[in-house]
């Protein structure tokens, strides 16, 4: 079953209107942030890990990012970039939520999400084939939502040129570790499959995505 585009449009529009009302209330200064959305990778809680911990787990990894976002931001300015991101990220996160993905990182205009892992296998029987399928369907529906939600709102609100995105999906083992210092730390995942998904998200042709199942 595919996502309900109308519901995602409604949710994205409501979120956008809240952001827009804040622009009206006060001057806006754009700050570039690349913080993790949480300190938890499925099955690995930060407060239960030691600094320098080393654990391996298998995940389907999805990377999605916006094409030519730096140039676009320069062309439309800080305020419209702010509003665009509230449309763009909200819509894509709704798709990930629909397919029960776990958002691991939001890096500027890029999103990394995981499916699978030990916890998902035990609780949801999400074996490799199911994890890859969910990640792949998520990527497919992101393309539809980009066209029917994101770009429709951008055009309607005169927020600049249409958005193009790239998506890559892989499956393999990743290393999970707790990194940082007390009171300032994060749980991070590293692995070739993450690098490959990121690479394909930046190189795949428009209106397509690449799935590499290892």
Regions found by a protein language model. Give the residues of each.
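Regulatory cytosolic signal-relay segments
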Residues: 1-56
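Catalytic NTP-binding/metal-coordinating core of nucleotidyl cyclase/transferase enzymes
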Residues: 47-134
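Charged, alpha-helix-enriched surfaces in structured cytosolic catalytic cores
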Residues: 87, 137, 164, 188-195
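Signal for well-folded cores of large energy- and translation-related assemblies
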Residues: 93, 97, 180, 198-201
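Catalytic core of nucleotidyl cyclases, primarily class III adenylyl/guanylyl cyclases
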Residues: 100-131, 149-190
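Acidic, glycine-rich loop-and-strand cores that form catalytic or ligand-binding grooves
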Residues: 137-144
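Conserved NTP-handling cores and scaffolds of large molecular machines
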Residues: 146, 150, 201-204
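Catalytic/regulatory signature loops of cyclic-dinucleotide turnover enzymes
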Residues: 170-172, 192-214
